[in-house]
């Protein structure tokens, strides 16, 4: 069984890699930082393939899926994503558009391509990492909260469509609250609540 994990170089993606490796899954580790992926692969007790790609780029996203697709691909985990902290009037538009490309377009593309293949086979599992932010409005992180709402609602709708087809393909959204990862540093945010350890999530 093979699993693709995006955003695998740190945080939740890294911990998911360890969890799946312990269950004997062959892993495809994807992130932008190849060196960190190779360091992670060396730590994991399973067969690992490293693909350095920026999933915010549509072409790289499509090429990534083309490289991993096949009958042995059973699991796709869309984990790559980031946030920005600040008032909507002040945050950088280019960074927000990159966030939308990463948090929405990449998830949409990989989910679409994977579910089409999985539906033909009659099995497969897609996990889209959303957030508790997907249930709420998000002053000072407006765009991030909106992207996670998209991920959550897309996943819920797809789950219903598959259920009506009586498909064995499973899709699920993971919606954690604050987690103690690099996300907080990149976003430039400190939460009032202490973040959960990524291993626990």
Describe these PLM feature segments.
Residues 9-10:
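Conserved glycine-rich cofactor-binding loop
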Residues 23-39:
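Conserved glycine-rich Rossmann-like NAD(P)H-binding loop of the short-chain dehydrogenase/reductase
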Residues 53-63, 93:
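The beta1-alpha1 cofactor-binding region of Rossmann-like NAD(H)/NADP(H)-dependent oxidoreductases
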Residues 87-88, 95-100:
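Substrate-binding pocket helix/loop in short-chain dehydrogenase/reductase
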Residues 111, 147:
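Active-site helix of classical SDR
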Residues 153, 160-201:
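SDR active-site lid
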């Amino acid at each position: 069984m093979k699993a693709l994990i995006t955003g695998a170089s740190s945080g939740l993606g890294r911990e998911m890699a360890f969890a799946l490796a312990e269950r004997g899954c062959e892993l495809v580790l994807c992130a932008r930082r190849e060196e960190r992926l190779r360091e992670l692969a060396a730590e994991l007790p399973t067969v690992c393939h490293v693909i350095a790609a920026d999933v915010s780029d549509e072409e790289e996203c499509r090429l990534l899926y083309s490289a991993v697709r096949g009958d042995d691909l059973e699991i796709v985990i869309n984990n790559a994503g980031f946030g920005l902290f600040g008032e909507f009037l002040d945050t950088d538009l280019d960074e927000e558009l990159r966030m939308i490309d990463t948090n929405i377009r990449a998830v949409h593309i990989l989910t679409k391509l994977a579910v089409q293949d999985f539906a033909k086979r009659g099995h497969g599992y897609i996990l889209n990492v959303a957030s508790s932010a997907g249930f709420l409005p998000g002053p000072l992180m407006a765009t991030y909260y909106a992207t996670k709402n998209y991920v959550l609602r897309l996943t819920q709708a797809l789950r219903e469509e598959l259920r009506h087809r009586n498909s064995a393909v499973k899709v699920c959204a993971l919606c954690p609250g604050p987690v103690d990862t690099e996300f907080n540093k990149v976003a430039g945010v400190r939460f009032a609540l202490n973040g959960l350890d990524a291993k626990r999530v």
